[in-house]
């Protein structure tokens, strides 16, 4: 499943485990170039591709042409009739919950993560709420609350942070409450924005630990 809608619509509901490579706005030729690169790197494996656009028309038509030009076998490209508009009428077809995606989650112990604080080759991202973050966090972390992780607003905030402030070539350590839902949700958002990211790791670090044990805590 390849979703080619713009972020605003995509963030409101997507097919679970679908991939995302936008072709909207259609007049933006740079998106066609990005899709060409994405297709060559990620879609050239002989598997069938089901395209999801807004209504199953213009976006899917343009994406089909781009994929064909990128070398994808035309007989393996399908358009989902009616696009996301039709899928939205099917109970449970679209979701904003990304925590159960098929991905090989990586974890690191809190102490090992703390030892990486200050490493210029590692990015730390704290996705806890603002008050919890202020009560104690690792030095030098970016912060983006994902407490309401399944809302378009929270996901858009995460998307923009990944786009504007994160380095796609460096690994990311994500800190949430327990290393579960918030971190997993953020993983998917970061992955989608930074598709060539080397490594993303969920970590659970209990901030009630005494700060003298971990001088890297603020």
Task: Name each region found by the language model.
Residues 1-3, 124-126:
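Structural scaffold elements adjacent to functional motifs in cytosolic proteins
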Residues 7-50, 54-122, 129-173, 177-218:
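Rhodanese-like catalytic fold shared by cysteine-dependent sulfurtransferases
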């Amino acid at each position: 499943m390849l979703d080619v809608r713009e972020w605003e619509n995509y963030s409101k509901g997507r097919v679970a485990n679908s991939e995302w490579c936008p072709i909207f706005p259609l007049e933006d030729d740079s998106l066609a170039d990005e899709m060409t690169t994405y297709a060559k790197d990620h879609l050239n494996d002989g598997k069938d591709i089901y395209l999801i656009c807004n209504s199953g028309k213009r976006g899917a038509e343009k994406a089909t042409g781009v994929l064909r030009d990128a070398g994808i076998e035309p007989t393996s490209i399908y358009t989902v009739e009616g696009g996301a508009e039709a899928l939205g009428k099917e109970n449970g077809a679209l979701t904003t919950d990304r925590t159960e995606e098929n991905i090989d989650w990586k974890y690191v112990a809190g102490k090992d993560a703390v030892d990486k604080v200050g490493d210029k080759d590692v990015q730390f991202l704290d996705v806890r709420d603002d008050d919890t973050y202020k009560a104690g966090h690792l030095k030098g972390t970016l912060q983006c609350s994902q407490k309401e992780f399944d809302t378009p607003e929270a996901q858009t905030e995460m998307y923009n942070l990944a786009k504007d402030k994160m380095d796609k070539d460096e690994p990311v350590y994500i800190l949430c409450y327990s290393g579960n839902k918030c971190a997993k949700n953020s993983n998917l958002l970061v992955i989608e924005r930074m598709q060539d990211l080397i490594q993303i790791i969920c970590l659970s670090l209990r901030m009630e630990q005494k700060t003298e044990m971990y001088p890297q805590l603020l």
